[in-house]
Amino acid sequence: MSVWTSRKAAEDNDTSLSSGIRAGLQKAVVTLHPEWVRVLQDDSVTLRCQGTYPPGDNSTKWFHNGSLTLQQDANYLIGSAKVKDSGEYTCQTALSMLSDPVNLEVHIGWLLLQTTQRPVFREGDPIRLNCHSWRNTPVYKVTYLQNGKGKKYFHKNSELHIPNATQNHSGSYFCRGIIGRNNKSSETLRITVGDLTSPSTFPPWHQITFCLLIGLLFTIDTVMYFSVQKGLRRSTADYEEPEVHWSKEPENKTISEEKQSFRSSRANSETPENR
């Protein structure tokens, strides 16, 4: 076996080994601490990357909105959150694939209705809501409202737990409470509870019916158009222009009659009385 053949075989083995390792890698996982995906400005948030590291290499790649950051630790600390920190975060280790994105929202206000995930839930999922105040200022007489109606009241601020979500829990939520002597309310958060399975590759029946109707109307219109065109061509082919025969007899007859009348008038004018 030649040196080139041996080298080529070794390279192929390395490539196969690398491909096999990449195929066997698991995704890294990003978690939030605290768990809330919605926070207020100046809150402290820690993102943790859970993945596999090779011996002696604990470096981590962090991406914010797709751009590589300077952070290389497994823990990504945001000491005082700002609006610019909002967005998607992903991480990757040497022996882990790129994680799924985790979305962080940073808001400005006195109160914020917090959730532990984006506000779309499956039926049966638990839902946790928290009426969070800026810089953890004490809040009293807290009311959680759904579609403008009071759902739960707490004299002292507490989380609202929905153990098994149903479609009846879908709607617009917000919270309000007393901070100092002032009544404050959070922004409205739309929560959806439903079937999150992959949608069918077939369009809904009403879309199918609409498309069939449009196709039928187009076909009828096309047939009528060509029928009319064919009828017009046939009518044109069957039409014969009538022959026109011109005769000079009436004209000649008129001229002769005028000559005869002129002669008669002349003869009458030459009477003896006029001579």
From Swiss-Prot:
This protein's record includes keyword Signal: yes
PROSITE patterns linked: IG_LIKE
Sites bearing Phosphotyrosine, chain numbering: 239
Modified how: N-glycosylated.
GO cellular component: external side of plasma membrane
Keywords: Cell membrane, Disulfide bond, Glycoprotein, IgE-binding protein, IgG-binding protein, Immunity, Immunoglobulin domain, Membrane, Phosphoprotein, Repeat, Signal, Transmembrane, Transmembrane helix
Topology in membrane: Single-pass type I membrane protein
InterPro entries documented for this protein: Ig-like_dom, Ig-like_dom_sf, Ig-like_fold, Ig_Fc_receptor, Ig_sub, Ig_sub2
Signal sequence region: 1-23
PANTHER family found in the cross-reference section: IMMUNOGLOBULIN FC RECEPTOR, LOW AFFINITY IMMUNOGLOBULIN GAMMA FC REGION RECEPTOR III-A-RELATED
Assembly description: Forms a heterooligomeric complex with ITAM-containing signaling subunits FCER1G. Interacts (via transmembrane domain) with signaling subunits; this interaction is a prerequisite for receptor complex expression on the cell surface and intracellular signal transduction. Binds the Fc region of antigen-complexed IgG.
UniProt protein name: Low affinity immunoglobulin gamma Fc region receptor III-A
